[in-house]
Amino acid sequence: MELWSELQSYQNLRRLLELASARTSSCWRILFGSTLTNVIYRAKEEYSSRFADLLSHNPGIFASLNLGHHSFFQEIVIRNLDFSSPGRTVSGLAFICFILDQWSAQTHLSQGYTLDYMAMALWRTLLRRKRVLGCLPAQRPHGLDPVQEEEEEEENLRAGLDPSTEL
């Protein structure tokens, strides 16, 4: 089981969070989940009291998530997760699953939205950290090749300027 290969795809990460959350039955988790799913679920159950204690220090997290103020969640939770080793990665995923369970239990938002938001926030953080560590190459934004851009600039010297005023 290669941990990082399972976390590279958004769909895999979303499915992993869904199967490790409380919304999935034990039977379904055993039949259709991976070993990683079961490990994350067990870690979430074992450390639930510690996770609850961590969340009690920041009581406004769920209120801000319900109101759509996601920057508070990003600052308090996501930026403090550590993915430097497989054990820390599993505990970070278990903590996100715990937050997902707590948020789903007390929100008016759909379960699909809460799952999608948590998966996307976590996936973007994983990609950003892998790029910083040099594991993943930075990709150029979609557009023209640099050579084509230079050729177009040479052909049309007034590109981007105000149109000429002719009488």
From Swiss-Prot:
GO cellular component: host cell nuclear lamina; host cell plasma membrane; membrane
Top-rank lineage group of the source organism: Viruses
GO terms of biological process kind: symbiont-mediated suppression of host apoptosis
Entry keywords, A to Z: Apoptosis, Early protein, Host cell membrane, Host membrane, Host nucleus, Host-virus interaction, Inhibition of host apoptosis by viral BCL2-like protein, Membrane, Modulation of host cell apoptosis by virus
InterPro entries: Adenovir_t-Ag_E1B_19kDa (IPR002924), Bcl2-like (IPR002475)
Region (Disordered) residue spans: 143-167
PROSITE patterns from the UniProt entry: BCL2_FAMILY
Location relative to the cell: Host cell membrane; Host nucleus envelope; Host nucleus lamina
Pfam family, one: Adeno_E1B_19K
Function recorded in the entry: Putative adenovirus Bcl-2 homolog that inhibits apoptosis induced by TNF or FAS pathways, as well as p53-mediated apoptosis. Without E1B 19K function, virus production is compromised because of premature death of host cell. Interacts with Bax protein in cell lysates.
Family (UniProt): Belongs to the adenoviridae E1B 19 kDa protein family.
Designated name of the protein: E1B protein, small T-antigen
Source organism: Human adenovirus F serotype 40
Taxonomic classification: Viruses, Varidnaviria, Bamfordvirae, Preplasmiviricota, Tectiliviricetes
